[in-house]
Design a protein with these regions (language model features):
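Generic structural signal for well-ordered alpha-helices
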Residues: 45, 49, 74-78, 120-130, ...
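Active-site metal-binding loops of divalent metal-dependent hydrolases
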Residues: 37-40, 91, 217, 250
């Protein structure tokens, strides 16, 4: 038996399979790319979804429950979820920590005035709302403004049973063994060209890493914006490079990472 195991471990087939796993750790691809869209604005429905669906690409849309687009176009958001896109949780009212440089934060939704209980309760309420939209009980979360604490206390620890993963905003990439599922890094888009975003993808493939991209406005809807032609050109590039890139919603990639890291 020992001789058999030794011969198996030394066999070319074993090393070939091991090499293949090391070279294609992301669902048999070199890299994973997750497209995320924050705040549920009309331009996601008007400008992002048509391109994504025409190319057969699936993304994650981080939904703030109070969004006027959700209120006015709810059936379209339901259709989006039914078509394979993830509706992620981006809180009920999009609270952020106010202060210098963030004068736009409304006093009622200033996270510096929140309690841990209020943050957790509002976030869980948004989960209930999203479940009513898509029927799903598993989803991921995105920190608003990248703010992760109420005072000095992190709140995500209280929500780990509610979410498979949580996306933050630090611009870094990590290999599958180094991904922190409750502090997933991402690159946010603010005026970048398709060519600039393509460089992110090339780096992810070279380093066999997870690349998460954060869009806000797509042809408008937010001051953090990408032009429609650049967005379309970038998605077309992704589609052309599916042989190297696994492109999937955050929930699918997070569950894959969780399974990998548990072994």
């Amino acid at each position: 038996m020992k001789k058999y195991l030794l011969s198996l471990l030394l066999s070319p087939a074993f090393f070939s399979n091991l090499t293949a796993q090391n070279n294609t750790p992301w669902n048999n691809k070199k890299a994973a790319v997750v497209l995320t869209y924050d705040d549920a604005v009309n331009q996601h429905l008007d400008n992002a979804i048509p391109v994504l669906d025409s190319l057969g690409l699936k993304a994650t849309f981080y939904i703030t429950g109070y969004s006027s687009s959700i209120r006015d176009r709810m059936n379209e958001w339901k259709k989006l979820a039914a078509n394979g896109h993830e509706l992620g949780n981006h809180t009920l009212y999009h609270p952020c920590v106010g202060g210098v440089g963030r004068e736009w934060v409304q006093p009622d939704y200033d996270m510096s005035k929140y309690t841990l209980r209020r943050m957790v309760d509002e976030t869980r309420m948004n989960n209930v709302f999203l479940q009513a939209l898509d029927g799903k009980t598993k989803r991921t979360f995105a920190f608003t403004c990248g703010d992760m604490k109420i005072g000095d206390s992190s709140f995500i620890g209280l929500l780990k049973n509610d979410f498979v993963a949580a996306r933050a905003v630090r611009a870094e990439m990590h290999t599958i063994d180094k991904v922190d599922l409750y502090n997933v890094d991402c690159f946010y888009v603010n005026g970048q060209t398709a060519a600039q975003m393509m460089e992110w993808v090339k780096k992810a493939v070279e380093t066999k890493s997870l690349l998460v991209i954060l869009f806000h406005g797509v042809g408008g809807g937010n001051s953090l914006n990408v032009l429609v032609p650049e967005h379309r050109r970038f998605l077309q590039y992704l589609k052309q490079n599916e042989k190297d890139c696994w492109i999937a919603p955050m929930i699918e990639v997070a569950e894959y990472v969780k399974k990998y890291q548990s072994h």
